[in-house]
Structure formats: structure tokens, C-alpha cells
Amino acid sequence: MGSLFDGIGGFPLAAERCGIKPLWASEIEPFPIEVTKHHFPDMIHVGDITLLNGAELPPVDIICGGSPCQDLSVAGARAGLAGARSGLFMEQIRIVKEMRQAEIERGHTGVNIRPRYMVWENVPGAFSSGEPKGEDFRIVLDEIVHVVCPSSHVNQWFSYGWQQVGWHYEDNKCSLAWRCLDAQYWGVAQRRKRIFLVADFAGPTAPLLLFDALPNQEVKNES
């Protein structure tokens, strides 16, 4: 696993507990880097995300990232993905594309193209940010689907906004699923809701991974 916007290593900690090796991390703040160096001494620190080339990074099966949330948060100025901080989400997409293209050029195909999976975490304000309301989250879904299906388009399904749980299939080419989780139910003594989105770039397993079950095909939310 590779961790972008790594902070103090939340994704590497979760990965390690699940038997997944955190191979490298991108972070620019000195103190968080020292924290992760202490807890994950074998993890490579690759530096500023804007200076990275996905084709040159060690290939990983999963790329995780919680891109800066300030421009999406209801507590901020709501600049959305056009903001300098939350707009860094596009750097995560760029790196995924660059790594996958390099893998294709090495002769890998199908499920063997890395990264197969991407995980994105952010604030629930992403559901309502943008114009029209919720457009930023639609763009997030669009950009993730475009990694493998560049001509596809994800529509906003509900005029009153996005649901806190949803999924999308692009034939058998890729799938993505998201859910809003509250830290108070996961061993943390505070209320802290966050969106967690999983994408599978080679199959239909994203809902299975995030929900531990495939959604009912008759009621799935598809564009």
C-alpha cells in the first residue's frame, strides 16, 4: 500500500493490522513524518505529492489518501475542488493513472495492473460542496471512474443531494462504493463523521469490500 497525504500514518496503521504492507508514504509536515518513521521504520517517505511521478514510485496494490478537506468542509469557505488544498485530490488521481500506465507498459493486464484499488477519505461536506449542490462529489466519482473508463460519466442521482451510502458499477470494468462513518462507533471518544470511498479498477468488488456484502442489484444506485 502507498499512502498519500499520510499525516501520522492512519492508513498504514490500518493496513498493517490487516496484514497489508505499507510500502511508501507522501507527507510534507516534519512532525507527522517523524511519528511515522518511529512506528513504520521500513516505510519509504517520498515527499511532496505535487513533485511525485506515479510511474517512478514503487508499484503498490492499493493507493490510499485523505486529500485536504478545508475547501470542502461546511466550516470553511467552501471553495470546493477549485480550492488550492482540496484540489490536491486531482494529484492523487494523476499518480494512480501514471502508475497504472507504467504497469501497462511493463506488460501487465487486467487485475495485475497496479494499483488495482484506491481508497479516498474526506469530510461529509463533499456531499454538498460545489454548484449545483453536490457537484464536487460527482466530480470525484467521475474522475475515479475515468481512470479506466475515460468516456464514462457519473450523474448525480438525487436532486436533494447525495446519500451517505452508495455505489456505482461500470459494467465489469470497475466499481466504487462509499459510506459515511462516525468515529464514535469505532473506538474514538468523539463524534467525527468521514466519507470512506473504495474503488476497484478491475472488477465489481468495491461494494463487497466496503459493505462486506454485494448490494441488492435491484436497488443499487447507478447513473
Question: Where on the chain are the PLM-derived regions?
Answer:
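Short, conserved SAM-binding/catalytic segment
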Residues: 34-45
